[in-house]
Amino acid sequence: KYWILSNIYNKKSELKQAYFGDSYLGVLIAKVVESHGIDFIDNPEYNDTSYNGLKIRLGLISSLLCLADTLDCDNRRVYIDKLTHSEIPDYSKIHWFKHYYVNSILIRNNIVTIYYCFPDISKNDLENYKKYFTYQTEYWINYCETKYEKYFETINLNFKIVSHYETSREKCALSKVNFEYIQE
């Protein structure tokens, strides 16, 4: 938000192309960007507004951004070599492994289909992976759907989540410590 707002008044800024040089539109875009990190539900700044005679549904746009970020949780966001060799807390590693084990997420006709790919491990361990990582992924999708329901119902957006699983010998397994973490 700060970056956008500071560039609105900078005459030499190239960012003005992002909001067509219109400072009011720039402020609206900054609000949507900011919404990604705050609880905006009851904030009147996110009520519907207008721009050049058009209705702008800031709350809905902000809700869709939060949902989009939640759905952008696949393995394209993970560098497994860095993850397995980095010194970050276990809970953070587990968060990124959640992304690593999601091959893709597709949305069609209000059905969210999540394609997981886990390492080729014992059946019992695989069930633990499925249970933990499916729950974590679905939790955040359901959280967004519930939290932003007042916005999503205006566009008839609700979800059914379907999960598909496969295994691969090329997928890295969790370390013993991380595996114990997901079993707690």
Label each PLM-derived region with a short phrase.
Residues 46-184:
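C-terminal effector/catalytic modules and regulatory tails appended to multi-domain proteins
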Residues 2-84:
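Histidine/acidic-rich helix-loop-helix segments that form or flank divalent-metal centers
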